[in-house]
Amino acid sequence: ESQGGDAPHEGRARTVLVYMIGDVNLWQEQWTNLNRLEAGWNDDIDGNLLVYLDPSPHTTQFPNPVLLEIVPDQTDAIVSRVVKSYPEQNATDKAVMRGVLEDAIRMYPAPSQGLVIASHGSGWWPAFADELVPTDDEHDIPQTRAIAGGDMYGTDVEVNDLAELLPIKYDFILMHACLMGNVETAYALKDKCGMYVASSATLPGASLPFQYITEAMFAQPAADFYHLIQTSCAFYNTLPEDEADLLTLSAVRTDRLDGLATATRALMEKVTADPELFYDKLKDRAYTYEDSPYQDLRQVLALESEGVPELQSDYEAFCKALADAVVLTGDVYQTLPPDMRLHPDDFCGLTCYTPQPDVKMSELNAYFKKTYRWADASGFGLLVGYQGTPETTPVP
């Protein structure tokens, strides 16, 4: 139900929609983020800032989902204007999600559109991975939830489905969720956004400081992600250690990802010729990001190329393509885990999945190769089907 009619709000340079799934265990942080968005907004900004709120039952101000137009406010109250109310609905249902996105575009048309997705995340790693991978006490798969929906429904939206349902190509997509800075997700969304911004690591519960970075999303002629990333890192430097161990952020130009895929494949075709040697080079050396299956893309290919002179030209071409695509990175840390085999200052801005050579992973590896275009384009899919001996099998 629209509040005040359906007449479009025209004349602004950019509309940014924050798709906020609040019915999760981070509901208090999401509520804080709403306050931060109001604090960071001012009426001189040439744009529209909207929030689709899928509310937690704990936030009784909004019993049902709403589309909010953010207005400036420095208090703890949420005073933004409800422009549309929705019946109870599943925020990660594909039809529901597309409908909300279309509402925002129709009601607040602008020549530039941005999208922020705020929820739990695990990159492309599917929420139904436990159906594909037999588990026991000795081999547990990482936590999986794709982009998590509300607790009421217990559903998720997979990255390939997200790419399909997005109604337009956005100027940027910012993922306010854990582990979304992986190349498989960026490549899946390359035709649906010009710039992709995300965290390779888990996103600390302190969230991004929207009170300081909101204006950067509306900079002209394009959003200022240098300011957004640097300000976010500076904010985390002020927090107590127990609130922010590690933050990583990167901005990726999606129009350069095909070039990265081509350069990656040229190298992968050579280093995968001996799969056992490939995995042996990574064993106990490549860092796996927290409770995920992801490793740093550059570190993987650096380890594979190390000490092989005939691979250096291909590796250098890969590094150039990577630097062309990942235009900004930022990190800040308080303490690092003792097993961290990659210093945050060395992270390249994109993680990757290396198909794991375990018979238990065969169905999931096949899903990866069939579903995600990066697998074939980059050559990582060449590893699907290889099954290593137990001593060479990396376990996330």
Predicted regions located by residue number:
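Surface-exposed loop and adjacent secondary-structure segments within mature catalytic domains
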Residues: D54-K84, S112, V116-M152
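Structural recognition of the beta-strand scaffold that forms the well-ordered cores
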Residues: T15-M20, N48-L53, Q113-I117, D171-M175, ...
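Terminal, contiguous helix-loop blocks that mediate binding/assembly
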Residues: R106, D130-V133, D137-P396
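Generic structural motif
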Residues: I21-D23, S56, H120, T254, ...
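Gly/Ser/Thr-rich loops at beta-strand to alpha-helix junctions
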Residues: D23-L26, S119-W125, L174, C178-N182
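N-terminal extension/subdomain marker
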Residues: S2-P111
